[in-house]
Every structure is written in structure tokens, then in C-alpha cells.
Amino acid sequence: MTHNTDLNLPLFERAKALIPGGVNSPVRAFRAVGGTPRFITRAQGAYMWDANGQRFIDYIGSWGPMILGHGHPAVLEAVQKAALEGFSFGAPTEREVELAEEIIRHVPSMEMIRLVSSGTEAGMSAIRLARGATRRNKIIKFNGCYHGHADSLLVKAGSGLATFGHATSAGVPQEVVQHTLVLEYNDVAQLEEAFTLHGPDVACVIMEPIAGNMNFVRASVPFMRRARELCTQHGALLVIDEVMTGFRVALGGAQSLYAQAIPGFKPDITVLGKVIGGGMPLAAFGGSRAVMEQLAPLGPVYQAGTLSGNPVATACGLATLREIAKPGFYDALGARTRALIDGLAGAASAAGVPLCGDTQGGMFGFFLLPQLPQNYPEVLNTDGMRFNTLFHGLLDGGVYIAPALYEAGFVSAAHTEQDIADTVAVARDVFQKL
């Protein structure tokens, strides 16, 4: 099967005439890797099929939400029942309360929660809430971490710690990003210096505990510990963006793993998405009662949404969370994910190709490097041309990974040992050609 497959190409041409770049989210366009994107017609379990009918083992999982795989029976039943009752009411429902209870039961740092429709909306709202609760304007984020496409977060680093960021997108005024300071991930000294210079003005620090848009880079325990200490010391809020990691790497999210290493650790605000919607447009942000009660209608921080708490989306999310809360779920998922990375590493080593990887729960990443990077500049050392060859070799062999060098991958409960073995077999052949 060639890169420009018969039926995907004309679909892409039709799409490009009507939709900018032919896609509704840029990474789907294959611009980073070249070739024609696959237009998916259906999915089931661990598999997707494109317009040509080619089957792929799916390691994107809709960029993370499909932790149970596609078309899980319990989720389908819940969604079908909810759809028959009504698509949207613009009024409260019991299921919103049930979903909030389920999330809070597993993520105790979230004493209260607000449901929204996307990770971008949740991150944007969390920043507004942090600013409103602290009566401060400045925020600290980290190079390589992605928190959605809200204006104040589309920022790259300035020339130094005394210089705030520059917009990474046209259409974002400098006046919007002038309060955002961008630091290097896992750099404790830089974070300390930033608070020395700007501490009284910092509303929050926002970070991914595992940076999935750097492929897979963990926040070190000392870095996370110091971020918590500095926020507490200076009266800033620590915002943990678990849109990708929440319920994906552990039932309590990545923050539950850090709490095992850092006694008493908890963020002030948590941002969730992806898995909590089970594939439907649903996200959330939450935190302590004192902070969350700053939101309208109780407090002065405004936030609203026509489709927030959508009854079909909440049904999908609730059914998903109830399935993944069953005993042994994460042990099995984590073992399968580890087997994938170990298999890929072994296949690469046999071919003399440098590859290192990491996993947590159902999330993984690998780099064509001899050792794991700790920040964005180190991630950039990956061989992009070699990755593109690997990507297309896997795709032609029926294995669908992210069409971008810096994106994490995902294993679902539907992936079998045979799926992992088949993936490694395809990769073994491709590595021999790199």
C-alpha cells in the first residue's frame, strides 16, 4: 500500500478545498511526516479502518480518550440510552452530579469540579480562575508543555527570566502574552530564580506532570516537589494539567503517583479531559472548595458553556470511568504498554537503531535517542527524518502511531498480546531498513 492510497487521496483533495489544510486539527494533516492522511471510516476494539478498507492497530486512541478501545459494549449501551433521552437540555442533570462524584472519588485534590467541553476550555478557565482567586496576573508555564490553544498559553520563551514570552501564533497580541513566563521543564534552579524575580506577581504555575507533547517526558520528583513548595511559599496556585494523564496513567491521575513520593502533595487546580469523556467532547477543571467557589454564580470569576455537562457526553464518560475503576485494570494495561515499548526497544537494538522509551499506565513514548530526554531542547535531538521513515513503514504495515515526532502514544484495554507481537514484528522489519 503506497502513501497516497487510492481513496484517501481524493477525500483529502475534497477536504482541502473546504477545510483549511484539509483537517480540523493541524496534526492530522501529516504535514510533519509527509504523505496523505488516512480517512477513517470505522473503528472497533484496538483497530481502525481507512477509506481503502486497510486495518490499522491503533496507538493514537483519538489522542488518548479511548482507554477501553473503540466501541466498548458498556459505553455504547450508556450512550445509546442517554441519546434516546435527549441530546442536550441546557439545564442540570443528575448524571452531571454522578460524574463529578466519580471523578472526585478518585482525585481527592478536586473538592469541587466544573464540567466543560474541551481541554483548551478547561485550561483557559483554570488560568482565569487562578488569576481571579489570587488577584494576580502573571503565570509560569514550561517549554514543550501544551495546555490547549488559549491565547495566553501559546507562548515561547523570551530572552531571559526577566523577559516574558512571545506569542507562537499569529493573531495573539503581545499584550496578551506579556504576563506569561516560559521556563525549561525540570529546571529547578530556573524556577527558583523566576519566583525570586516575580514571586509576588505570580498567579499560578501550570505544568503537565508527564509532558505528552514532548512525546513522553516526566516531571522529576525534585522538580514537582519544588514547584509545590514555591507556589505555597509565594501564594501562587499550582495547576496540574492532566488532560492527557488523568485516568490514563493511573486511576488517580499522575498526581497520585507524585503523592506517593511527596508526602501531602496535591495541586490547587487540576485540569482533566480526554478519558473522562470516553471519546465525547468533555473536560473539567477543579480544585479546593475555597478556590472553586470563586467561580460564578458564587464568585466573581465568570465561566459558562452552552454544552457544558452534555447528557450524552457525561453518560459516555461515566460509563468509561466505571469500567476502568474495576480491580486490576491498570495492572493489565500497564503490563501491555510496557511489553510494547520493551518489544520496540529490542527490535531497534537488534537493528543497531538507538531507541529509548518510557511508559505509565496506558501512555507511552519513545525517542530515537540513546537516553531519555528531560526537557524540550533535549527532545529536539531526535532524528526527525528517521522517525518519518519509521512512521510510514509502520503505517504501511498496518500500525498507526501519531503522525508527529513529539506526540505520546496510547494503548487500550482492547489491545491483545497478539496485537503487541504483530506491532513489534512490523517494527522489526522497518528498523532493519533505517
Swiss-Prot record:
Pathway: Porphyrin-containing compound metabolism; protoporphyrin-IX biosynthesis; 5-aminolevulinate from L-glutamyl-tRNA(Glu): step 2/2. Its EC number is 5.4.3.8. One of its GO terms (cellular component) is cytoplasm. Its cofactor is pyridoxal 5'-phosphate. It holds the Pfam family Aminotran_3. The modification N6-(pyridoxal phosphate)lysine is found at K274. InterPro entries: 4pyrrol_synth_GluAld_NH2Trfase, Aminotrans_3, PyrdxlP-dep_Trfase, PyrdxlP-dep_Trfase_major, PyrdxlP-dep_Trfase_small. It is found in: Cytoplasm. Gene3D superfamilies: Aspartate Aminotransferase, domain 1 (3.90.1150.10), Type I PLP-dependent aspartate aminotransferase-like (Major domain) (3.40.640.10). Homodimer. HAMAP family: HemL_aminotrans_3. This is Glutamate-1-semialdehyde 2,1-aminomutase. The gene is hemL.
